Amino acid sequence: MLKWHGLAGNKLMTSNVVGSIHVVGKDHTFTGMEETPVAFVEWKVPSFAFADRKTQEGYFEEAINIVHEMSGGRQPRDRIFINVVHAVDGAWNFNGKAVTNAEIGAEVAKAG
């Protein structure tokens, strides 16, 4: 994800990307009201992230490919769903302190 925002290798952002895996049985996931094995990728990010179309398209294609390949090709690409949840400006935190988008930008620039 950082690559698509021009932040690959940025120490501050790398240390603040947090992920989790939630395994949900296929008998608990549905599309069209039918049990369907699906995969979800979700990001919770500051409100400026994923703002341009090139980043959205590039990241989504790459993430879908990764999930599809990790499944050994068993997970259909059309059953891999991605969404991005934006935090309100000021409702993000670094080191236990709420920060605004401007403060994030300043910290990212300092971290190089």
Specify the residue positions occupied by each region the protein language model found.
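A domain-level signal for the structural core that forms small-molecule/cofactor-binding pockets
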Residues: 1-112
